[in-house]
Amino acid sequence: MFKTPGFTLLELTITLAILMIMATIALPLYHQFMASVELKNSSRLLTIHIQKAKYDAILRHKSVVLCPSVDLSTCNSNWDTSLISFIDTNQNLQRENNEEVLTNVELAHRYGSLKFQKFGKKLNSIVFQGDTGLPRESNGTFTYCSYKQLKNFKLI
């Protein structure tokens, strides 16, 4: 009698059970890993665009606004989607059609949310003054909150 190579039903069931246990353990760790990657990327992108907005304000001697945006052209209050920086010629902290967009970047957070706690005026943007490049009345703290973890991380 010849033996045919293959797996018995018992071997297949045990293998699938072991794979399911490993997947159950690995899935939360994967989410935690992706949240930490998103945190590092957000911190890097924020630092780059804050420095770029400050540089543009000093270089052009005009106020530059860095703010969150949904459509990459107007400011809103959601820091999770994207950022824009523009020259604010009329000093109203909102982008008009004639004001040039200097940079825009999509953030698209999936594993957490980004918040900006501002000191001073309640508008949700950072203004870099053209004479010094300093963020007058715009200082604050960026905080990244993971959806699955209990602790928050201060970025900048």
Language-model regions: role of each:
Residues I25-K40, T47, Y55, L59, ...:
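N-terminal helix-rich module
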